[in-house]
């Protein structure tokens, strides 16, 4: 998708001096064709236009182990890609009553899949790249499980929306101990 590459190039140009890094989300089920960018070929094109800033690439939980392994190998060997974010919303985990709706499923039911993907990634990246975990982290216990699985950082979203800022403070405090 050449249009996406041009969009990222424009984003880098306009924000490079304003930010410390970028998360390139090529995993959203809400944007038609975006998940097609989850390829080594696209990562190589991204490297070619990447600024001298931290760049993490966000992947979907629905990738096969083989596909994720190829992407992680590319990230591990890259001098321009800082790491990855695992995982975004899922189309496969959708509840039956929501199957016909657009978008993806996030929250609690995503946790086990995300935890598994984080474990795979930690083994592949061997601490050489930054691994950010997200997906179903709705408690301190789950945040700690992500860290034990190999995540360097833990991101939350759905739990923050429903539990508020206090949740973030509680999790951050537990992870700091």
Feature-to-residue mapping (PLM):
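Active-site beta->alpha loop and helix N-cap motifs at the rims of alpha/beta catalytic domains
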Residues: 1-23, 28
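Structural preference for beta-strand elements that scaffold enzyme active sites
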Residues: 21-23, 54-58, 81-85, 130-132, ...
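Short beta-strand/loop segments at the ligand-binding rim of alpha/beta enzyme cores
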Residues: 51-63, 121-133
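Glycine-rich phosphate-binding active-site loops on the catalytic face of alpha/beta enzymes
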Residues: 26-28, 83-90, 141-170
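Glycine/Thr-rich beta-alpha phosphate-binding loop at enzyme active sites
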Residues: 26-38, 68-127, 167
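Acidic (Asp/Glu)-rich catalytic clusters
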Residues: 12-18, 47-51, 74-79
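Catalytic cores of alpha/beta
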Residues: 63-78, 122-127, 137-154
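Active-site glycine- and acidic-residue-rich loops that bind
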Residues: 1-9, 35-37, 56-77
């Amino acid at each position: 998708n050449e249009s996406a590459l041009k969009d990222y190039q424009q984003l880098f140009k306009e924000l490079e001096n304003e930010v410390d890094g970028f998360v390139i989300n090529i995993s959203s089920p809400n944007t038609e064709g975006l998940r097609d960018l989850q390829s080594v070929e696209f990562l190589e094109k991204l490297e070619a236009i990447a600024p001298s800033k931290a760049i993490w690439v966000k992947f979907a939980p629905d990738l096969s182990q083989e596909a994720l392994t190829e992407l992680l190998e590319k990230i591990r060997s890259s001098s321009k890609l800082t790491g990855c974010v695992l995982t975004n919303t899922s189309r496969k985990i959708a509840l039956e009553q929501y199957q016909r709706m657009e978008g993806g499923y996030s929250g609690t039911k995503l946790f086990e899949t995300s935890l598994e993907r984080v474990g795979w990634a930690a083994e592949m990246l061997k601490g050489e790249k930054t691994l950010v975990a997200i997906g179903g982290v709705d408690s301190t216990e789950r945040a700690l499980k992500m860290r034990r699985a190999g995540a360097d950082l833990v991101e939350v979203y759905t739990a923050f929306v429903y539990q508020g800022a206090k949740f973030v403070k509680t999790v951050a405090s537990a992870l700091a101990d």
